[in-house]
Amino acid sequence: MASSSISFSCAPSLATSLFSTTSSSPRLLSSRFLGTRNLKLRIRPARLGPSNGSRTTCWFKFGKNGVDAENAGIYGSQSRDDFDRDDVEQYFNYMGMLAVEGTYSKMEALLNLNIHPVDILLMLAATEGDRPKIEELLKAGADYSVKDADGRTAIDRANSEEIRDLILGYSTQKA
């Protein structure tokens, strides 16, 4: 995959909002947030934009020389203990389970069994067939053999053979 860098020009609508248009005197644009290279540039609101010679670039990079989400600690680098009850509730809401169930009683029942939140999330994700979430949770150390109140595991709750195979396949890769 080819690496690329991303650069932005300072948009007139953004920059003009930084200045008072009632004053006719030019002002200095020296924002570290915008990352402008020429900090001695005097800017009049009427001339603000890419044609004034200023250039703004992002301070983050993607691709070969950048950082991916997993190494940045954003996705996939969580451990079991990084998940808590709030994550279970947020996922329950996000996946529309509250709308379907009409109550938090099933979620609360799972939480009251003293099952670790990451294992509850795996059961819910398997029920929904949420492949990316299942992969994330298995990487974090979720245990697919934990049973719910009905004695069902994440494998039992999986909504398709593909999801069962994903969970079982991860367990054989890990071993």
UniProtKB/Swiss-Prot annotation:
Subcellular location, record wording: Plastid, Chloroplast thylakoid membrane; Plastid, Chloroplast envelope; Plastid, Chloroplast stroma
Keyword annotations: ANK repeat, Chloroplast, Membrane, Plastid, Protein transport, Thylakoid, Transit peptide, Transport
GO biological process, one term: granum assembly
Disulfide bonds: none
Tissue: Highly expressed in leaves and seedlings. Detected in roots, but not in germinating seeds.
Induction text: Up-regulated by light.
Primary location group: plastid
Lineage: superkingdom: Eukaryota
Transit peptide region: 1-68
Signal sequence segment: none
Ranges: ANK repeats: 117-149
One GO cellular component, as annotated: chloroplast stroma
Phenotype reported upon loss of the gene: Not able to grow photoautotrophically in soil. Pale green, slow growth and no bolting. No appressed grana in chloroplasts.
Protein's recorded name: Protein LHCP TRANSLOCATION DEFECT
Organism: Arabidopsis thaliana (Mouse-ear cress)
Gene coding for it: LTD
